[in-house]
């Protein structure tokens, strides 16, 4: 019995060692078999889904955190008063000035249109200039008007409306045409009806529309910087789309010089609107001297036509403006619209 107990303990230990040895052998065999299987198996191509997932992971790793992302800043509205305004500026009318010179000074203008790059303009403005045989005056005006409007931080475009042929000049009808053509390009907020021979002297005379029709030429050098006469509403005026539609635009029947601006004033008054003006020390213009144009003689019939305005304004204006477009050309500094507008009725 004493001999039997030691033998039993010894056998039990060997039994444990045997179980442990067998277990380790099995694990070693499994590991060896798995490694050989992986090595000997053919390489399988990655699935498209695997590649996409890998790309997504790579993109996520390469993408900086949100606070490092560079997104373009949102444009804010331009200030009520532009910080670029200079006030009264000295005007020069160089005889050597060329169109290329003016284009070179206004690189930000494309096809007559400009928009501030650093803020959103408070109003979009179409400047309409009736024209015939006044190339030098137009050049001087463009040279000063483009930087003038840019300093005011406006979104604007300039339209030059040329009367084709040699019939008597009709400023008012050309302005109706300019208005209708400009609206084909953009839904402008404000329209500036601008004579080609008047150059603004002070950029605080801001070319935007008001709640009432606005007259911008309070004084000019030719009149000692005084209003030409009480009720004068010519030279340069500003009206919104709604205001201009409300009066049915200009009359189409004023051939030759004079009367059409007074007709527009009567239309404004008939609609119970009030003409507003900037301060006299700001609304100043230089009129570039010129002789009376051939084909733009004084309209001797203007007083008779003015007497009929209250009777005919509803059917004589934008709704009766007929014309034929001869040429529409988008030049660097302005949109040229050449039209045939007919002849005066005898």
Each predicted region: which residue ranges?
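Active-site beta-to-alpha loop of glycosyltransferases that engages the nucleotide-sugar donor
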Residues: 76, 117-122, 129-140, 164-166
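Short N-terminal or domain-adjacent regulatory/targeting segments
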Residues: 89-118
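Residue-level recognition of beta-strand->loop/alpha-helix junctions
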Residues: 111, 160-162, 279
């Amino acid at each position: 019995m004493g001999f039997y107990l030691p033998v039993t303990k010894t056998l039990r230990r060997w039994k444990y060692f045997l179980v442990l040895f067998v277990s380790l052998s099995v694990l070693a065999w499994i590991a060896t078999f798995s490694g050989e299987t992986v090595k000997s198996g053919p390489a399988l191509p990655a699935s498209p889904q695997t590649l996409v997932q890998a790309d997504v992971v790579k993109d996520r790793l390469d993408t900086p955190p949100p606070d490092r992302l560079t997104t373009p800043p949102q444009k804010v509205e331009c200030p009520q008063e532009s910080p670029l305004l200079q006030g009264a500026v000295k005007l020069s009318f160089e005889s050597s000035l060329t169109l290329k010179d003016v284009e070179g000074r206004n690189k930000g203008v494309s096809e007559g249109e400009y928009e501030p790059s650093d803020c959103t303009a408070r109003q979009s403005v179409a400047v309409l200039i009736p024209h015939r045989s006044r190339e030098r005056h137009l050049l001087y005006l463009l040279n000063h008007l483009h930087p003038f409007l840019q300093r005011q931080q406006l979104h604007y475009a300039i339209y030059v409306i040329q009367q084709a042929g040699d019939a008597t000049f009709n400023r008012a009808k050309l302005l109706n045409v300019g208005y209708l053509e400009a609206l084909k390009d953009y839904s402008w907020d404000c329209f500036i009806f601008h004579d080609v021979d008047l150059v603004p002297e002070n950029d605080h005379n801001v070319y935007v529309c008001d709640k009432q029709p606005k007259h911008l030429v309070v004084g000019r050098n030719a009149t000692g910087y005084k209003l030409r006469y009480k009720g004068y509403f010519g030279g340069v005026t500003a009206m919104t789309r709604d205001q201009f539609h409300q009066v049915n635009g200009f009359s189409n029947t004023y051939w030759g010089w004079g009367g059409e601006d007074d007709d527009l004033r009567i239309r404004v008054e008939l609609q119970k609107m009030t003409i507003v003006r900037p301060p006299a020390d700001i609304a100043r213009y230089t009129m570039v001297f010129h002789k009376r144009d051939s084909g733009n003689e004084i309209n001797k019939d203007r007083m008779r036509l003015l007497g009929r305005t209250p009777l005919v304004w509803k059917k004589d204006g934008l709704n009766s403006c007929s014309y034929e477009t001869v040429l529409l050309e988008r030049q660097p500094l302005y949109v040229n619209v050449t039209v045939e507008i007919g002849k005066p009725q005898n």
